[in-house]
């Protein structure tokens, strides 16, 4: 369990916005530690996207936003802490900041989203015996709802990274997808609904064992709603229909089927608001 404790204050004398990560977890032995420039980037993005998304991204707009974190903590790690999967924690940096801003500008923030993108990497041999190693590919869950707008489905905040089309992946390696679709109802209910996650399923076209490295997110703690909105559905990582919680590299059999069900975003506002408006 990783704790991100965040305080957002405004210095009325200097006009600065100060974001402090004091109290955050210490460094992890796994590669999920985050360097300070990554933390700074996602922190300032969260502030700027609420204040004015059209602000130019330059020194003048960034200077009043001050980000601090204890040296050596998980969001300000130091060498030799491993950082290869830093997105697993780093993509959550914006969430506690948005919760703090909700107290003063509830119409500008969004509910919790699906968190970090799910990343996949595969190694093995094709039917001809030739070795292959895939590049890392990823899938997003749903974004949290805004006060007056539903959250976009299969879209990650704060990255907005796009996925490689399955046709490209099938042409590049011996993989065969059987499903790539939205996950209806996974977004949290509310006056505005959270975005839905997605379902992806595949098998490998091989007669040899193969290796799967899947880095998932939010399979236990669902994205929270805001203002009475309901949480989105947590994600599920399945092998042959059975849930898997391990993030280690897995040895897979030729006939194994992998299914990813990414989380839905949290809803915003009480769901009853829909019925009251209809009446």
What are these regions (language model features)?
Residues 1-279:
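Glycine/proline-enriched, intrinsically flexible loops and inter-domain linkers
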């Amino acid at each position: 369990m990783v704790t991100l404790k965040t305080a957002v204050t405004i210095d009325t004398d200097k006009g600065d916005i100060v974001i402090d990560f004091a109290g955050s977890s210490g460094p992890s032995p796994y590669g999920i530690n985050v360097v300070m420039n990554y933390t700074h980037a996602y922190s300032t993005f969260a502030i700027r996207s609420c204040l004015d998304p059209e602000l130019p991204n330059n020194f003048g707009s960034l200077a009043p936003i001050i980000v601090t974190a204890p040296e050596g903590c998980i969001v300000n790690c130091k060498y030799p802490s491993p950082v290869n999967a830093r997105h697993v924690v780093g993509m959550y940096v914006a969430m506690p900041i948005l919760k703090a801003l909700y107290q003063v500008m509830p119409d500008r923030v969004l509910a919790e989203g699906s968190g970090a993108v799910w990343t996949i990497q595969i190694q093995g041999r094709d039917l001809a015996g030739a070795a292959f190693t895939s590049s890392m590919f990823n899938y997003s869950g749903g974004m949290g709802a805004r006060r007056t707008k539903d959250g976009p489905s299969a879209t990650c905040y704060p990255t907005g990274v796009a996925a490689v089309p399955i046709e490209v992946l099938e042409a590049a390696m011996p993989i065969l997808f059987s499903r790539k679709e939205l996950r209806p109802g996974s977004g949290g209910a509310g006056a505005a609904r959270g975005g839905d996650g997605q379902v992806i399923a595949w098998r490998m076209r091989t007669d040899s064992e193969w290796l799967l490295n899947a880095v998932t997110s939010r399979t236990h703690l669902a994205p929270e709603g805001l203002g009475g909105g309901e949480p989105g559905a947590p994600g599920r990582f399945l092998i042959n229909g059975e849930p898997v919680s391990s993030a280690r590299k897995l040895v897979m059999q030729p006939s194994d089927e992998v299914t990813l069900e990414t989380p839905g975003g949290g809803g915003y506002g009480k769901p009853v608001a829909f019925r009251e408006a209809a009446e």
